[in-house]
């Protein structure tokens, strides 16, 4: 029980700005087991967003609430995944060789491609969530971040790391397939309860497809994955899920 709590808190501490202030075991096995809780952390974040939406929907227009929810997410996560998307785009669109791309991705400064990617990412999230709320799919506020994290877990089933060292290496190739498939089954079952089978499976397949395409792009550009590409995967998975759900 103590190890389970350790791994759960480790995921919160690693992926959010929520102050845990505890000395936790941070071995590779803890991250491997803790992967089960990554969608749970996303559920907590999405759940808090949904409660904010419910609390404000009678006082503010839906479009204003969505902006506040995106701001809230950025504050809670520290913009971790959005930063990964920006760094990935800066590197990949630089059209340089592998070593230079990785060097660009490690640069803390954001470039023009990263800026464009962030603007498009935020605009799409805003418009898609706003449109889905108006369509009666407010539960997408909760589901989208969960699907994004599930996409990360599937990407991490690969063992191809682009760097010898990096924060992403504690996840890449360090996933248990039974854990990934088990938590995915639970999430899909819950999503089916709220959205129905068709509106769950098709957007989810779309998210997995974009994850696989990103994986192929990573192999082509840097011969593997990094922590930044995992963040990019989360953002692309969320956007794809929301986009296809809106089309249903």
Swiss-Prot record:
Family to which the UniProt record says this protein belongs: Belongs to the CobS family.
Catalytic activity: alpha-ribazole + adenosylcob(III)inamide-GDP = adenosylcob(III)alamin + GMP + H(+); alpha-ribazole 5'-phosphate + adenosylcob(III)inamide-GDP = adenosylcob(III)alamin 5'-phosphate + GMP + H(+)
Gene Ontology molecular function: any one: cobalamin 5'-phosphate synthase activity
Organism placement in taxonomy: Bacteria, Bacillati, Bacillota, Clostridia, Eubacteriales
Pfam families given in the database record: CobS (PF02654)
Domain of life: Bacteria
Broad class of the protein's primary localization: membrane
Protein name in UniProt: Adenosylcobinamide-GDP ribazoletransferase
Cofactor(s) named in the record: Mg(2+)
Pathway: Cofactor biosynthesis; adenosylcobalamin biosynthesis; adenosylcobalamin from cob(II)yrinate a,c-diamide: step 7/7
GO cellular component, one term: plasma membrane
EC id: 2.7.8.26
